[in-house]
């Protein structure tokens, strides 16, 4: 299993989530955060010279089966990319074990994959 962490623009979150749901990955963790990379706290739509130390970002974490790595990354990139600096980064790390606390399921059975969440209110 792999943990895929993506730092993206907040306004791209809904589109990325929709793309992940379409490929069978509805479950993820999302955290609001601030940061900057090469753009150094500049936003292309702000007045020239306006600079802040950090820009709003969203970090999403999703644990996937190894075989799904490429399609999950494709979904994130296609939903998050604007082509401008500040689109974000993706980090991938190995997960040794996953355990669903409620049921005790382990490994890939503990992942929220291919489950129908459309019936939830």
Regions found by a protein language model. Give the residues of each.
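Positively charged, small/polar-rich N-terminal and surface patches that mediate targeting and assembly
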Residues: 1-121
